[in-house]
Amino acid sequence: MPEKWIYWLKELGQENNDIVGKKCANLGEMMKGGFNVPPGYALSVEAYKRFMNETPVTERLLKYLEGFKADPNNVSDTLKYEKASQDIREMVESIKMPSDMEKTVKEYYSELCRIAGRENIPVATRSAGPVSHPGQYETYLNVSGADEVARNVRRVWSSTFNTRSIIARARLGLPLHYDPIGVAVLTMVDAKAAGVMFTVNPVNGDESKVVIEGSFGFGEAVVSGNVTPDRFLVDKVTLEIEEKVISDKGSEYALNPKTKEMEYKELPADKKKAPCLEDREIIELTKIAKKVETHFGCLQDIEYSISASLPFPQGVFLVQARPESVWAKKKKESVLGKKSGMELLFQKAFTPVKVKT
């Protein structure tokens, strides 16, 4: 019997990291924990393998790579990798999934539409690697229609052949033609504001604070660094908003209603320096962040989105959660750097004695 390769997010949990990738597994885990996550489904790494092995993709890739020679550590060879990436991605995206896979992907999308109560709902197709490498692969927003969902899943798969990913594999001595990932197909939130929050102050490592960053529109503006976000510092215990830094945001990442494309558009003058979040939203996000940290048992880096059409607080959604990495790593290094008295004694005992001659 073929291995299962597609799941509703609500079926998943942390234990499924290796099956569907960390992003999908964490979304499912948050659903199980009672957090508000947009409905969606996940294609597993097995789906990637099926696509690569049951279509001509792998055979064509290997043939192409036979003649490819470049040094990943030589900057002058970067153009070779860029050309290879472009050629390979075009190749991958031009080949359709096996017919039974495409049919199933579309059926799951139709069920999402039924749940939402309307046809052709917009979704995001998001990459989900078994190991968390934020920004390594690609995400596509506002994808509507079953055919477009199937096409954009292939685009996510093809992003494993973007230039930086190929170079990274070459440097590690890994096969260039193979890097299985999962894909999340997640219902889009019609975001009036979005961003990221940390259950530790990323500036100084203070674990008694939550830091929320946000901007108007979709969160990609904040995650990508294209907009300087507003920043809110909140005490975890008292829920007091201790600091507000409101930036001149300039633009927002939003849907163009005419072209149906996502784009940056200039904010009206009265919104550029206006806070993107209300106080009640800041406090609600802080409460949620604390619960996510408790649920996962470690400091968290969380992406949120606030709906323009749903009432508060039902419109506050989480679209990503992962362990905070910077201060957790520093804390680990600090602990590893401390030696016990017994360790110091053994170190002294086995230190070679220097003898002058």
For the regions a language model picked out, list residue spans one by one:
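N-terminal beta-alpha lobe that positions the nucleotide/phosphoryl donor
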Residues: M1-I181, A193, K273, L277-R280, ...
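Short, function-defining helix-loop hinge/capping sites that tune catalysis or transport
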Residues: Y48, V143, K209, L233, ...
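Short loop/turn segments at secondary-structure transitions that flank enzyme active sites
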Residues: V131, A191, F218, E324-W327
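NTP-handling and nucleic-acid-processing catalytic cores
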Residues: Y140-T238
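Conserved catalytic alpha/beta cores of large enzymes that bind or transform nucleotide phosphates
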Residues: K209, G214-D301, I306-L310, K338-T357
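Short beta->alpha transition motifs characteristic of CBS
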Residues: G214, V319-V326
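Cytochrome P450 core scaffold surrounding the K-helix E-X-X-R motif
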Residues: E220-S224, W327-E333
